Amino acid sequence: MRFIHTSDLHIGKLLEGWDLSEDTDYVLDQLVDIAVKEKADCVVIAGDVFDRSVASEDCLVKYDLLLKRLCIDHGIKVLAIAGNHDSGERLAANNLLLELSGLYYVVGRPTETIKKVTLKDEYGPVNFYLLPFFTPNDIKKFFNPEVSKYTDDSAFRDLMAHQEIDTSQRNVLVAHLFAAGFTPSGSEFGLSDVAGVGNIAIDRFKDFDYVALGHIHNAQHIGR
């Protein structure tokens, strides 16, 4: 299966007051062109679709046009999750209706069971697990509400312990988080993450054949 892994589009971002609308249009055009040229089966957007939780009308139109070009014009599926800059509720509005099309899948808020979307190619099923941005408290309330000290790694460990993943199949995790061993880039890390508190241990991803992450603003390869 061929898919394009991207993230952190940050549609609507201003750079020191400078409007990046034209730059955004150029990048989104490139995304569509590459997906079409490479004959991608789907495009994975691993969080931070928008730069602000309340996106402007212009930003919403840009994203709608991107989906229209990929899904409707070219039949390329899109799988998306919310990042920390997105409003999960807004991003996933009408998601049940959109899923009926079989072309667009989006998850806005973390739940006890990670959303699984299964696509098929000539070799069989590929399972995409869509995990939007979460804080330790988001997961703590599901499994360990009484625990006082709870990190991102603890939260991810407990979340994975409650998933049923068939490791004999091909599995892809889509998430918006920091993995241990990343190189800090841009503004998407704080002091806690520098100290390693916000990092997920690499061995937590052992059930997945590929992990499509967002949150870091340059391309990196971590793990096997």
What kind of feature is each model-predicted range?
Residues 1-45, 49-224:
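Extended recognition/assembly regions associated with phosphoester-bond processing machinery
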